[in-house]
Amino acid sequence: MTSMDVRAVPGVPESELDAATLAALPDSAPPAPWDCACSAVVWVARATPAAADALHPDIRASGRTVAVVGAMVRYLDTPVGSYDEVLGAVAVLHRGRARGSVPFMAVDSLASLVGGRMNWSLPKSLAEFTGAPAAGSTMSASGAGWRVSATARTGGPAVPVKLAGRLAQWWPDGIVRESVLQSKGSMHPALVRVEVESTGPLADWLRPGLHVGAVIERAKFLLPEATEGA
């Protein structure tokens, strides 16, 4: 994907890029794979009909939506440096396996915005962040017409985790491509209080309230090049 195509990456209205952001974008970004280290607060909620509506039609038609995953992430080490991120992903059961698709993602790094859109067709937009993804702390993100915040309360000791997940995104050339994310780290089980405000549909599917989740103290993951999915 070229830099001229980044605006064609589909997402929810909160992921749209305004003229000022488009004018400030770098022409390129480091290619996949990206090897990253991060800390995060994540939460899981039941998928509503609005979650299916948030997906690109080709991904929506590929399976049954089963859950929504939200996250506030602080990237400590990436090919474009450190940055913060908020995201909403929808899990879809496709041919007996779950895969996630991301209709909403925002960062405070122009280089990450371009890299996400060019390498994985992730609809990254620009946001401002406060706080940290840690137990007892509130991390907030705000963009044009929207705001998301998450406050986590942990219980129990940290648990080592090693996970693999499939990311499926529709690309502007009409192809659904997948990447398999490999990660390992440690997490504390948590309850996460989420607030979502938007002039658009974001709160209809990335729902506010108290959700089951986790605080990830530090994790490393590899996100490889996207390839045409099954």
Regions found by a protein language model. Name each.
Residues A71-G145:
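Aromatic- and glycine-enriched beta-alpha-beta binding-site module
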